[in-house]
């Protein structure tokens, strides 16, 4: 009757030596060289600790219906028309004040509960002798992020265009993009910039100076800007026709930079450490097997006895 091998298992062999022997010292050294160098290699590879991370999020953006407009005229030096939604600013303009017709509509194109774009239109009435050569426009927004930390701020889109020829309409189509000078936190509530971009209650003209408004805004570490506006300046205005500003501002998905939390840093470091450690475990396992099998250090080889045989020997 032919016999076949149906099952097999390796015979475990142990190696005994004193705690103060060369074999014990070698095993201690091999263990240290197995676990410590992978940590040093991962650390020295620059990127062991995750100092900054990023994620994508569709921000919650809402137009606050706050507008500040300055239209530059070419009829006389220093000529301009101005208007805003702030009564204190309008009172300061005196003869330069001109009230436009404004309409604004926000649109949620993908029906996810968050607005995706703003359609803004402003019609500024002009006299037949008035000609517009440039426009400065500020629109303010409420800007919120919720995925990691809850970040709330009041931001703005600043548009400035000037041309050599008098225009009848300015068309703008751009994105309201987030700009970060420093990463956000990974959790908590951040409302440090949840303050008005324009101090609309101030009676002082200096608080409405565009240079000061933009300079103070740029001091923030987190801002929004209107990117790729692609302004189109249309010329040829009828005598009684208004000057029109047409703007389409999209609220795109943003890549948010943030400071990772403790456990995220540990997870990232652990993955790097273990990937290198596996190589060292494989290498030193074979080194230890060679050293003990060939008696490079003096030990007493002992063949491990199966559990059943140990039990029988104990009973006898």
From Swiss-Prot:
Transmembrane spans: 23-43, 262-282
Localization: Cell projection, Cilium membrane
InterPro entries in UniProt: TMEM231
GO BP annotations, alphabetical order: camera-type eye development; cilium assembly; embryonic digit morphogenesis; in utero embryonic development; neuroepithelial cell differentiation; regulation of protein localization; smoothened signaling pathway; vasculature development
Residues bearing attached sugar chains per UniProt: 194, 199, 221
GO cellular component: ciliary membrane; ciliary transition zone; MKS complex
Membrane topology, record value: Multi-pass membrane protein
Keyword set, alphabetical order: Cell membrane, Cell projection, Cilium, Cilium biogenesis/degradation, Glycoprotein, Membrane, Transmembrane, Transmembrane helix
Statement: the UniProt record of this protein carries the keyword Membrane: yes
Domain of life: Eukaryota
Cell membrane in keyword set: yes
Family: Belongs to the TMEM231 family.
Subunit field text: Part of the tectonic-like complex (also named B9 complex). Interacts with TMEM107.
Free-text function comment from the UniProt entry: Transmembrane component of the tectonic-like complex, a complex localized at the transition zone of primary cilia and acting as a barrier that prevents diffusion of transmembrane proteins between the cilia and plasma membranes. Required for ciliogenesis and sonic hedgehog/SHH signaling.
UniProt cross-references to PANTHER family, sorted A to Z: CHST5 PROTEIN, TRANSMEMBRANE PROTEIN 231
Protein name, as recorded: Transmembrane protein 231
Name of the gene this protein is made from: TMEM231
